[in-house]
Each structure stands twice: as C-alpha cells, then as structure tokens.
C-alpha cells in the first residue's frame, strides 16, 4: 500500500443539493448523485440494509425524485466491491501512481436531520484495489462475466472518457498479511473517529488525528495541503474528487486507516 485516496462521493451542493443523512439511531447512508442518462438504478430501486432510496430522499427533503436515475457508485455493500472513475479525475489517479494494493477511503457531506445536527464531512466506506480495468470494452466484459450492473459499464458510456473501474480485494491486505476485514465495505454507524470536520467548525474545516498525521512528510500528492501542519488542520477547498496521500513514506497514516476499518468497518 503506497497510496491512500480520500475520495469525495455522494450528494453535494450541486449534485443533489443537500447532505446525506445520519439517522437518529446513528446509521448513515451516502446518497448517490443523480444521473441524467439511464443507469442501472433509479433512486426507488436502492436498498441499503432495509433503508430504501425513497426513504433516503424523504429524510433529507431532496428535490430529486424517486423515479430519477442515480449514479450508484461506488458499490461497497455487494459481494464484489467496484468503484468507477473517468475523465481528468482518472488521469490524476493514474499519474499519481495509484495502483493495486492502494486504498480508497470514501467521504461525503452528512448531517443528522432529526436533531438539526451540524454539516460535516464523514467517512462512509473503503475499497482496497485488487485490479484496475481500463477501457469500456474490458469493463463491460468483466461486468457481464460477473453479472454486475454498474454505471461505468451500462448502456452508452461514451460520456465516460478515460473510463476505468477499480475492483476490490476480497480481504484487506498489507505486505502480504491478510486481515479479517473485507477489502471493501461501508461504515454503517456514525462515530467521531470517522468525522473529518473539526468539532463545531464548518464542514470544510478538517482536523486529522495528530497521533498519526503530525510528523508526516510530503503527505499530499495533489491539491490538498495543511492549513496548520502542527495542529493537523486542513481548509478543504474546491470540488476535486480525489485527494491522494503518500503513505509509503508516511506509514503512520496507513496505521490510522487500517485501524478505523478494523474497528468500525
């Protein structure tokens, strides 16, 4: 594992227009963004351990209709974990050396609507890469063989330039050591250890655990940077999707990621 990618997914201010929900019992579900063209799923078709897509939209008072198509990606609650990427974001991942063994940590905008909670950035899932399939023909062939429907291999995919999917390992693995934790999955309950946002700050103000991040060296490989390195705070700017961390030279950050997966995954 040389790279950890903090990957922003789910409803945002432009796509969906509201946060994904944290329910009163602590469950959280990332709502996929809308997709204008036909995709494998409409919102009414979604089911996250008994919580339907229609319930999700109602919980957050979304303007999206249950009959609208959604971009249901990444797939983290299925037997095979898959994440699709394309365009400039995929180019960035490739150019920064993201490959097999590396780990995506997915985060998004969440809020507990039942108690008018704060807007926060919260981790909701992970995927460790087993292999990368590039090009629509390879993607469609693989998905057909596995009987999987995924937006990046469904119907007309011409809008996905530089199309790729990342397939998950069966189990989490580091330096040949396999763990009991799956190679992909969801954090299904909220926990402070999964919150990126600094307490009582706007969601764009992050504070990462100094125990793991304080002495990091040249950690950020693309647009992310420290606001205060000693305090491990970040002012999250812009709408980039993929934030790539060098954990080959910062192994303590790897310990942080593995720890939260093993404890909360």
Locations of the language-model features?
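Short, compositionally biased
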Residues: 114-136
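Short, flexible loop/turn elements at secondary-structure junctions
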Residues: 8-13, 80, 87, 108-110, ...
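Contiguous surface segments at macromolecular interaction interfaces
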Residues: 1-50, 132-265
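Short N-terminal edge-element motif at the start of the domain
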Residues: 51-120
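Conserved hydrophobic/aromatic beta-strand scaffold that supports enzyme active sites
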Residues: 6, 103, 124-126
């Amino acid at each position: 594992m040389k790279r950890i990618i903090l990957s922003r997914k789910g409803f945002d201010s432009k796509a969906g227009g509201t946060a994904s929900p944290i329910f009163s019992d602590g469950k959280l579900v990332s709502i996929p963004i809308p997709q204008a063209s036909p995709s494998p799923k409409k919102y009414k078709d979604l089911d996250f351990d008994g919580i339907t897509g229609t319930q999700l939209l109602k919980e957050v008072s979304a303007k999206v209709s249950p009959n609208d198509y959604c971009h249901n990606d990444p797939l983290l609650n299925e037997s095979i974990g898959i994440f699709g990427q394309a365009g400039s974001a995929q180019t960035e991942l490739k150019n920064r050396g993201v490959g097999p063994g590396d780990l995506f940590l997915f985060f998004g905008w969440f809020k507990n609507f039942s108690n008018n909670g704060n807007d926060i950035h919260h981790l909701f899932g992970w995927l460790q890469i087993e292999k990368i399939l590039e090009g629509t023909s390879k993607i469609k062939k693989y998905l057909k063989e596995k009987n999987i429907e995924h937006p990046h291999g469904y119907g007309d995919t011409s809008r996905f330039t530089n199309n790729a999917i990342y397939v998950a390992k069966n189990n989490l693995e580091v330096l040949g050591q396999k763990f009991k934790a799956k190679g992909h999955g969801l954090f299904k309950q909220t926990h402070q250890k999964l919150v990126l946002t600094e307490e009582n700050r706007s969601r764009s103000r992050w504070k990462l655990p100094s125990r793991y991040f304080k002495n990091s060296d040249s950690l950020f490989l693309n647009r992310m940077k420290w606001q205060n390195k000693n305090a491990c705070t970040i002012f999250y700017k812009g709408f980039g999707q993929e934030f790539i961390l060098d954990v080959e030279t910062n192994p303590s950050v790897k310990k942080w990621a593995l720890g939260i997966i093993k404890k909360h995954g």
